[in-house]
Swiss-Prot record:
Assigned keywords, A-Z: Aminoacyl-tRNA synthetase, ATP-binding, Cytoplasm, Ligase, Magnesium, Metal-binding, Nucleotide-binding, Protein biosynthesis
Family: Belongs to the class-II aminoacyl-tRNA synthetase family. Phe-tRNA synthetase alpha subunit type 1 subfamily.
Subunit structure of this chain's protein: Tetramer of two alpha and two beta subunits.
Amino acids binding Mg(2+): 268
SUPFAM superfamilies attached to this UniProt entry: Class II aaRS and biotin synthetases, tRNA-binding arm
Name of protein: Phenylalanine--tRNA ligase alpha subunit
The record's free-text note on cofactor binding: Binds 2 magnesium ions per tetramer.
A GO cellular-component term linked to this record: cytoplasm
First-listed, main subcellular location of the protein, grouped into a coarse class: cytoplasm
Nucleotide-binding found in the keyword field: yes
InterPro entries: aa-tRNA-synth_II (IPR006195), aa-tRNA-synth_II/BPL/LPL (IPR045864), Phe-tRNA-synth_IIc_asu (IPR004529), Phe-tRNA_ligase_II_N (IPR004188), Phe_tRNA_ligase_alpha1_bac (IPR022911), Phenylalanyl-tRNA_Synthase (IPR002319), tRNA-bd_arm (IPR010978)
Organism (species): Bordetella parapertussis (strain 12822 / ATCC BAA-587 / NCTC 13253)
GO molecular function: ATP binding; magnesium ion binding; phenylalanine-tRNA ligase activity; tRNA binding
Length: 348
């Protein structure tokens, strides 16, 4: 690059700014823009060459041209940044255009889960009994033999203890007692009663397990059992509590309840509870709904209480049974086949 004096350098500097503007505008992408930048601002660029040539000028011209070259450098850098921004915006616009969402397409709603009908019954039962002062117990599903059977007055030779009726676990607890999957929720009542002082007023809903299956039975099923222990509890209290529960659960006063003598090792006397609707599709049919009775004195002793002082009643109902009657389902297995067409109707 050759020049004579400051005037020729001034013209050259002005021309470099114009050239830079043209080169930057012609750059179609970032790589081309960087090449154009090197032509003017690089180590071997035109402005660098001019700065090196300032030594050939006298001090006054050097000061004047140095200021002009710095000004040109700032102008070229401004042009460079503007072009960079323009290219970046163009790239963004192109990407957005290629990723455009067609808002005219029909939307896809998110699949919402629902409450299983048996769990819906569980929650409703809890709500009803809480409203009349009952607490809700919880406990382990893997239980020891004593809490599941012995504490509830089941003799050692009782058929329920056999492997044909109970799922045993190949383990023992810390006291050496055999472990099993609880066959009812009564063990939760045993644990609760041994940790609380009378009056004891509690229900125990939960999963239970027995070696059984069919249209009305399942190896895993749900129960709710109730217990009321105090000094002056009678069968009349049991009938009143359970009748009120049924009328509230089925939302109907058009039902009657009867007690049939029965036998359970943990109650004496014992009774099956039947109900009959006096209107509707089930009118006139007695339906078995629960087992019940006055808590056996030996069970009261196993609670750590004096049966001469404390008395009480207990009852137990299958949550699947209550659900089937409430919704008119005839086959229990439908609840656990995972058919969304069946289950979805309970959440509409």
């Amino acid at each position: 690059m050759r020049f004579e004096g400051s005037n020729s350098m001034t013209l050259l500097v002005d021309d470099l700014v114009s050239q830079a503007q043209e080169r930057f505008a012609a750059a179609s992408d970032a790589a081309a823009l960087e090449n154009a930048k090197a032509r003017f601002l690089g180590k071997e660029g035109a402005l660098t060459v001019l700065l090196k040539a300032l030594g050939k000028l006298d001090p006054e011209q050097k000061r004047e041209m140095g200021a002009r070259i710095n000004q040109a450098k700032q102008q070229i850098e401004a042009l460079l940044n503007a072009r960079r921004a323009a290219l970046a915006q163009a790239e963004l616009d192109a990407r957005l255009a290629s990723e455009t969402i067609d808002v005219t397409l029909p939307g896809r709603g998110k699949a919402a889960g629902g409450i299983h009908p048996v769990i819906r019954t569980w929650e409703r039962v809890e709500e009803i009994f809480r409203s009349i002062g009952f607490d809700v117990a919880d406990g382990p599903e893997v239980e020891n033999d004593w809490t599941n059977f012995t504490a509830l007055n089941n003799p050692l030779d009782h058929p329920a203890r056999s492997m044909q009726d109970t799922f045993y676990v190949d383990m023992h607890d810390a006291d050496g007692l055999p472990l099993l999957l609880r066959t009812h929720t009564s063990p939760m009542q045993v644990r609760y009663a041994r940790m609380h002082k009378p009056p004891i007023k509690v229900i125990a809903p939960g999963r239970t397990y027995r070696v059984d299956s069919g249209a009305t039975h399942s190896p895993m099923f749900h129960q709710v059992e109730g217990l009321w222990i105090a000094e002056d509890i009678s069968f009349a209290d049991l009938k009143g509590v359970y009748t009120d529960f049924l009328r509230c659960f089925f939302e109907s006063d058009d039902l009657v309840v009867r007690f049939r003598p029965s036998f359970f090792p943990f109650t004496e006397p014992s009774a099956e509870i039947d109900m009959m609707f006096t209107s509707g599709p089930n009118r006139g049919r007695w339906l078995e709904i629960s087992g019940s009775g006055q808590v056996h004195p030996q069970v009261v002793r196993n609670f750590g209480l004096d049966p001469e002082r404390y008395i009480g009643f207990a009852f137990g109902s299958g949550l699947e049974r209550l659900t089937m009657l409430r919704y008119g389902v005839n086959d229990l297995r439908q609840f656990y086949e995972g058919d969304l067409r069946f289950l979805r109707q309970f959440n509409e």
